């Protein structure tokens, strides 16, 4: 789907149905309002395989040989709508996502979900704010979110790793495997026991 234009959903406008992409391209389309590539307000939007949704714009001008100006607006998600990653995304292009709501200092915005082996944050790009990278938050399913992280200065740990937690989305930052290589100190000199992140 290429070279189309509309007020909303220059390439595809899904209002009350499902959209399933297991490959194919939605490229170089334009919308005057939202969703240069896809405007999705339907029931489910599943993606997998070699999907390419890129080069779509909002407010661009068609030159006959392409689009000039405008802003990146590949997939537009109104409040509460997300993409489901139904299988591995094998394409080389990131899927750009623009959301109606935006993250703030107390709230993240979810853009996608799927199992941990398929929902990879590097396959997506958040278009509302290029400084915000898409992050993965693990649970029964993996959520891909746009978040203005507020990382704790304290360490959280399990049996194998330690990391810092975001107070907003509860995501992990800089997980590090325990090494247990702290210098051994005589018991009489210890203020407290050594851990994997601090010496005795």
Where are these regions (language model features)?
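Short, solvent-exposed linear patches
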Residues: 6-8, 31-36, 41-43, 159-163, ...
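Thrombospondin type-1
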Residues: 23, 147-200
């Amino acid at each position: 789907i290429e070279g189309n234009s509309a007020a909303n959903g220059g390439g595809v406008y899904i209002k009350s149905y499902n959209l399933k992409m297991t490959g194919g391209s939605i490229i170089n389309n334009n919308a005057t309002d939202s969703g240069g590539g896809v405007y999705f307000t339907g029931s489910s939007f599943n993606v997998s395989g070699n999907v390419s949704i890129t080069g779509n714009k909002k407010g661009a001008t068609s030159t006959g040989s392409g689009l000039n100006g405008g802003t990146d607006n590949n997939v537009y998600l109104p409040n509460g709508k997300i993409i489901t990653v139904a299988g591995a995304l094998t394409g080389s292009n990131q899927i750009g996502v623009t959301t109606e709501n935006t993250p703030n200092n107390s709230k993240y915005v979810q853009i996608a979900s799927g199992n941990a082996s398929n929902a990879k944050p590097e396959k997506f790009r958040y278009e509302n704010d290029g400084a915000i990278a898409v992050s993965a938050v693990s649970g029964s399913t993996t959520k891909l979110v746009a978040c203005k992280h507020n990382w704790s200065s304290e360490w959280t740990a399990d049996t194998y790793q330690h990391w810092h937690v975001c107070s907003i989305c509860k995501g992990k930052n800089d997980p590090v495997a325990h090494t247990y290589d702290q210098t051994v100190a005589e018991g009489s000199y210890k203020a407290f026991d050594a851990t994997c992140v601090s010496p005795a």
